[in-house]
Amino acid sequence: MSQQYTLPPLPYPYDALQPYISQQIMELHHKKHHQTYVNGLNAALEAQKKAAEANDVPKLVSVQQAIKFNGGGHINHSLFWKNLAPEKSGGGKIDQAPVLKAAIEQRWGSFDKFKDAFNTTLLGIQGSGWGWLVTDGPKGKLDITTTHDQDPVTGAAPVFGVDMWEHAYYLQYLNDKASYAKGIWNVINWAEAENRYIAGDKGGHPFMKL
């Protein structure tokens, strides 16, 4: 049997991010969508193990896409839940990340300019994907980037990400992605983002281990 991954518990109740993300969305997103990625990853890894034992090279090649897609979905969502927090627990409060805030202001000129740039990137995503603030290298360089479908961030440390798949917002916002992108700033966990930024600045990504 291959290593079995499990669905991580949410660090807050399903209704804790309202009114910005509804309880219904959170329950479906976590219990159904994320669980599906976990199940798919476990199944793909088991298929990989059996193919390796059978020396079935074509099968080994074909299963890689399922590992990438479902593994990426598991990584991305595990990071996503932790980079959100209820308002009453500090969600949306950039002052909880003084080091990161200073780096953002140095990179973009102001926090508001950074938010505008990030939202523009989010709304420019075609189809399904993620928007990320990442840090790259020991000098703490910050950049905004996107990943397609469930591809995870590689070559940099994700500081925080925003899920732009329709399942993350459609039941509440319909096709109004702009309102979803605007509202999610109220529940960004800046304390967690600060920890990730500092860890990434030191060249470590301990938060990436699942």
Swiss-Prot record:
Q: Sorted alphabetically, which Pfam families does this protein's record hold?
A: Sod_Fe_C (PF02777), Sod_Fe_N (PF00081)
SUPFAM superfamilies, alphabetized = Fe,Mn superoxide dismutase (SOD), C-terminal domain (SSF54719), Fe,Mn superoxide dismutase (SOD), N-terminal domain (SSF46609)
EC assignment: the record states 1.15.1.1
Concerning InterPro entries, the annotation shows: Fe/Mn_Superoxide_Dismutase, Mn/Fe_SOD, Mn/Fe_SOD_BS, Mn/Fe_SOD_C, Mn/Fe_SOD_N, Mn/Fe_SOD_N_sf, SOD_C_sf
Per the entry, the cofactor note is: Binds 1 Mn(2+) ion per subunit.
Q: Which residues bind Mn(2+)?
A: H29, H77, D163, H167
Q: Which reaction does it catalyse?
A: 2 superoxide + 2 H(+) = H2O2 + O2
Q: What cofactors does this protein use?
A: Mn(2+)
Which keywords annotate this record? Allergen, Antioxidant, Manganese, Metal-binding, Mitochondrion, Oxidoreductase, Transit peptide
Report the domain of life of the source organism. Eukaryota
GO cellular component: a single term: mitochondrial matrix
Q: Where in the cell is it found?
A: Mitochondrion matrix
Instruction: Provide the GO MF annotations for this entry.
Output: IgE binding; manganese ion binding; superoxide dismutase activity
Subunit and interaction comment? Homotetramer.
Say what the protein does: Destroys superoxide anion radicals which are normally produced within the cells and which are toxic to biological systems.
The family this protein is said to belong to: Belongs to the iron/manganese superoxide dismutase family.
Protein name listed in UniProt: Superoxide dismutase [Mn], mitochondrial
Origin organism of this chain? Aspergillus fumigatus (strain ATCC MYA-4609 / CBS 101355 / FGSC A1100 / Af293)
